[in-house]
């Protein structure tokens, strides 16, 4: 398992979000106000500080949270490559909106105007992303340390646990809200997984994209030596496609942790349809 090609190739929305998170965190950290960015009952129900609602969705309250959060946001760019920048923008908006509603309900139940009950930072996006990470990203390597079994996904989970517990109850509450938001997106409530923003809005992020990286600079990933053959047996197209899979499609599947050769074979049988090829590989991996 890996995050795919290094950098933000084919992930301009993630790049914009990471930059905004870093800038807001550093700016308010220098001014000494980062610890006061967490939402409270007073912020929403008494003074209605709109600016704080926005800033709290980006700025972390500590350097430790920033490092863990940026690491996870950077890794989760794999999902933008998988579903496209437009739908990923919808995922970000939906996760943030649902999390804000849940946090507002939580604050309304406490009614404590003096305490910042919720910590600040993009917890909604980070922990909503753990839902597809848990369900869709396959384990490609297992190993043991002192009798304890780990996988290549364990480091991501450990970073998530560290971030979840970084401010104790304040961060646990926001993290749980993010997981619930990600679960609702996964359940396709209101058909949200098919929703898209107008193209002119999504294209605003294109200016943040980095120069594309050559796909053949990526070393082959190994999952299982028989995964490619399993993928072919798992799906038989009536008319084998003679179209060579695009390098971009192969890179997308490789970025999800699949072996390069298996990805190529799956794309051939799926007629270069990334979603269908993903299903083929996941089905083969489950056998």
Curated annotation (Swiss-Prot):
Signal peptide coordinates: none
GO CC annotations on file: autophagosome; endoplasmic reticulum; membrane; phagophore
Subcellular location(s) of the protein: Membrane
Molecular function terms from GO: serine-type endopeptidase activity
InterPro entries: Peptidase_S54_rhomboid_dom (IPR022764), Rhomboid-like_sf (IPR035952), UBA (IPR015940), UBA-like_sf (IPR009060)
GO terms for biological process, alphabetical: heat acclimation
Covalent S-S links between cysteines: none
Transmembrane segments: 10-30, 53-73, 90-110, 117-137, 145-165, 172-192
Coiled-coil annotated residue ranges, if any: none
Domain UBA: residue ranges: 244-284
Topology term for the membrane: Multi-pass membrane protein
Protein's UniProt keywords contain Nucleotide-binding: no
UniProt KW keywords: Membrane, Transmembrane, Transmembrane helix
Pfam annotation, one family: UBA
Record PANTHER family: RHOMBOID-RELATED PROTEIN (PTHR43066), UBIQUITIN-ASSOCIATED DOMAIN-CONTAINING PROTEIN 2 (PTHR43066:SF21)
Entry's family note: Belongs to the peptidase S54 family.
Functional summary from the UniProt entry: Probable rhomboid-type serine protease that catalyzes intramembrane proteolysis.
Protein name: Rhomboid-like protein 18
Organism listed in the record: Arabidopsis thaliana
Organism ancestry: Eukaryota, Viridiplantae, Streptophyta, Embryophyta, Tracheophyta
Gene: RBL18
